Amino acid sequence: MSVMFDPDTAIYPFPPKPTPLSIDEKAYYREKIKRLLKERNAVMVAHYYTDPEIQQLAEETGGCISDSLEMARFGAKHPASTLLVAGVRFMGETAKILSPEKTILMPTLQAECSLDLGCPVEEFNAFCDAHPDRTVVVYANTSAAVKARADWVVTSSIAVELIDHLDSLGEKIIWAPDTHLGRYVQKQTGADILCWQGACIVHDEFKTQALTRLQEEYPDAAILVHPESPQAIVEMADAVGSTSQLIAAAKTLQHQRLIVATDRGIFYKMQQAVPDKELLEAPTAGEGATCRSCAHCPWMAMNGLQAIAEALEQEGSNHEVYVDERLRERALVPLNRMLDFAATLRG
C-alpha cells in the first residue's frame, strides 16, 4: 500500500542565471582554480548535473564526477584536506558528515534542491511522530537534519534493493521526499510505503505527449529515464536508473540513438561513455505548458568558474559548510547503514 502525504509547499523561486563569462575570463578562472587547488591541498568533487566545463575541470585536476554518494565517498578517501563540492547544498552537508575533519567548500551555499526544500525538518518530524511504527527511509537529497531523523538514507541506485530488504523483514516504511521515486520503488517491491510528496523540479517536468511525439520522430531510439520522473514517463522507458546506471545502460543498449530523461548535465559523461551514439534530450515543455527548469537544475547552474575561484580564495561563511556535531553524529548513523548495505550488494 502506498499512501500519499502532501505538505503545503510553495513554488520555489529560481535563482538568477549566472552572468556568462567571456573566453578570456573562463581561461583566467580555470588557471586560477588549478593554482588554488594545489595551494589549498584541495580536490574538486562535481555532480553529473553541473555544467560541462565544471565537470571537465574536475577531471583535469584529479577530482571526481559522480552522484552525490560517490562524491562524498571519494572525498572521504582522498588525502586532500579540503573538498570543493560543486553541486547543491545537501551534497556539501553529506561530505561534511562523512569527513568532519576536512574543510568543505562550495561555490555557493545558496544552491538548493527542490526535494530538500520540500521536506522541512519540523513538518517531517511531526509526520514521523504520527507514524511511530514505521521505519524512516529518506533519499540522499535531504538536509542533514532530515537525515538525522531517519533510520536509513538511500540513493536511487540502491533504493529498490534496500526497500525490498526491509519489506522482507516485515517492516512498514515512511519514504521521503521524492514521490515519483517512492511510487517506482513501491511498484517494484510491493512494500507498504507511506510517502511524502516532494518532487525534483527537473524530472517532474518531463511530458508524456511530447515524449511520445519525439519517440515517433525517432522510432529507433531507446528511452532512458531517471526514476525521479513521473510514473507515466517511467513506463515509457527502455531503461530506468540512477545517473550512473543510466550511463551504464547507454553503453549496454544496442540502440545508436538515445532519448535521455534526466538533467542534461549528464550528457558530458554519457557522451564520453558512448562517443558514437546520438543523445537527445527528453522534452520538458509541451502539452500546453512551458518548461521552468528546461532539463537543467537552476541551482546546479550556480556552480560557475568565478564562484569556484571565490570559494577557494575567500572561504568564510559564504562558502564553507558547517554541520552541528551532534546533528552530524546522528545523521552519520543512517548514512553508514546505507554504505554498509551498499557494500553487501557489491559483494
Swiss-Prot record:
Checking Pfam families in the record gives:
NadA
One GO BP: 'de novo' NAD biosynthetic process from L-aspartate
Q: Which cofactor does it need?
A: [4Fe-4S] cluster
Annotated positions binding [4Fe-4S] cluster: 113, 200, 297
Residue sites binding iminosuccinate per the record:
47, 68, 139-141, 156, 226-228, 243
Which EC class heads this enzyme's classification?
transferase
Mind telling me which GO cellular component terms the entry cites? cytosol
What catalytic activity is recorded? iminosuccinate + dihydroxyacetone phosphate = quinolinate + phosphate + 2 H2O + H(+)
State the UniProt keywords alphabetically: 4Fe-4S, Cytoplasm, Iron, Iron-sulfur, Metal-binding, Pyridine nucleotide biosynthesis, Transferase
Asked if the record carries the keyword rRNA processing, the reply is no
The UniProt GO MF terms for this protein read: 4 iron, 4 sulfur cluster binding; metal ion binding; quinolinate synthetase A activity
Q: What is its EC number?
A: 2.5.1.72
Q: Give the UniProt subcellular location, in the record's own words.
A: Cytoplasm
Q: Which cysteines are joined by disulfide bonds?
A: none
Instruction: Give the record's cofactor note, including how many are bound.
Output: Binds 1 [4Fe-4S] cluster per subunit.
Principal place of residence: cytoplasm
Q: Which domain of life is it from?
A: Bacteria
Q: Give the family per the record.
A: Belongs to the quinolinate synthase family. Type 1 subfamily.
Biological role:
Catalyzes the condensation of iminoaspartate with dihydroxyacetone phosphate to form quinolinate.
This chain belongs to the protein called Quinolinate synthase
Origin organism is Escherichia coli O127:H6 (strain E2348/69 / EPEC)
